[in-house]
């Protein structure tokens, strides 16, 4: 569905997601969830592991990072995460891909400047 919607988009379409995340949504990239990559804070505290799963809150960022079993979350690691493609876990993975290597950055530049060139 995303591939059909986003595959031949007009130049004027503005999205607030990274180009590699949009490619992930279109099925052109594979990523693992990075559940700690987009932490949520609200009046109840720091929500773990992400705002989609209701697994409680902690009062400090340190508690969130050190006391959450991050390896227990993500597609294939937790049944609640099955079929998830939401930005709160996968956008961080796409950003890591972008800035983790020169080739990732080059892919992002190409997609940004030439979105319909494949």
Residue ranges and their predicted role:
Residues 114-118:
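Long, charge-rich boundary regions
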Residues 2-109:
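Accessory C-terminal segments flanking Radical SAM cores
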């Amino acid at each position: 569905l995303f591939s059909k919607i986003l595959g031949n988009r007009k130049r004027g379409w503005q999205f607030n997601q990274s180009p590699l995340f949009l490619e992930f949504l279109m099925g052109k990239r594979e990523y693992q969830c990075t559940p700690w990559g987009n932490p949520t804070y609200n009046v109840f505290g720091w929500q773990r592991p992400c705002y989609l799963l209701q697994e409680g809150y902690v009062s400090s960022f340190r508690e969130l990072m050190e006391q959450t079993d991050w390896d227990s979350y993500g597609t294939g690691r937790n049944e609640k995460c099955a079929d998830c493609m939401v930005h709160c876990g996968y956008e961080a993975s796409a950003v890591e891909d972008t800035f983790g290597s020169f080739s990732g950055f080059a892919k992002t530049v190409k997609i940004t400047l030439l979105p319909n060139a494949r």
